[in-house]
C-alpha cells in the first residue's frame, strides 16, 4: 500500500509541470528584447503579428514594447495575443482584451501574471 501510494504521488508530481506547460492560454508574454547600442530596449529581431495562425497570412510588424495575454494556441507554435489593462489610464480595462493577432510564441518571454501590465 505504501509503495503504491508513493508511486502514485511521484507520478502526480512529475506530471504537473508537463500538464502546466502544455497550455499557455492565460499566460502573460512580453516580446524578446535586448539592450541596443544607445542603451534602449530593441527587439531581438522583427516580430510579426499575423491575421491568422499560419505563415502565409497577412502580417505586420509588432511595434509595441508591451505585455500581452495569450488568448488561444494553434499548431505551429502560434498564439493569439490580446491586450492587458493599462493602469496609466483612468479606466484601465478600457483597452484590455483587444485581439492584436497571431504571433510565434518563440518570439516572446513569459512574464509573471502580477507584472502583466
Indicate where each model-derived feature is located.
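Extracytoplasmic/periplasm-facing segments of secreted or lipoprotein envelope proteins
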Residues: 34-56
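Bacterial N-terminal signal peptides that target proteins for export
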Residues: 1-8
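Short aromatic-glycine-enriched beta-strand elements
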Residues: 76-80
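SH3/SH3-like (including bacterial SH3b) beta-barrel domains
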Residues: 51-64, 70
Amino acid at each position: 500500500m505504501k509503495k503504491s501510494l508513493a508511486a502514485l504521488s511521484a507520478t502526480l508530481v512529475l506530471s504537473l509541470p508537463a500538464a502546466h506547460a502544455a497550455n499557455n492560454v492565460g499566460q502573460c508574454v512580453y516580446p524578446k528584447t535586448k539592450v541596443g547600442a544607445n542603451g534602449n530596449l530593441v527587439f531581438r529581431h522583427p516580430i510579426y503579428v499575423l491575421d491568422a495562425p499560419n505563415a502565409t497570412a497577412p502580417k505586420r510588424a509588432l511595434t509595441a514594447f508591451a505585455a500581452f495575454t495569450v488568448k488561444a494556441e494553434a499548431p505551429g507554435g502560434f498564439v493569439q495575443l490580446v491586450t492587458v489593462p493599462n493602469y496609466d489610464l483612468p479606466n484601465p480595462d478600457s483597452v484590455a482584451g483587444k485581439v492584436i493577432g497571431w504571433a510565434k510564441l518563440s518570439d516572446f518571454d513569459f512574464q509573471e501574471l502580477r507584472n502583466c501590465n
